[in-house]
């Protein structure tokens, strides 16, 4: 699955 915007925020 492609990285979603919400996932990006969690990655940070």
Swiss-Prot record:
Keywords: Amidation, Neuropeptide, Secreted. The modification Phenylalanine amide is found at residue 12. GO terms for biological process: neuropeptide signaling pathway. It is found in: Secreted. GO terms for cellular component: extracellular region. Detected in the thoracic perisympathetic organs in larvae, and the dorsal ganglionic sheath in adults (at protein level). It comes from the Eukaryota. Belongs to the FARP (FMRFamide related peptide) family. This is FMRFamide-18.
């Amino acid at each position: 699955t492609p990285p979603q915007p919400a996932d990006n925020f969690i990655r940070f």
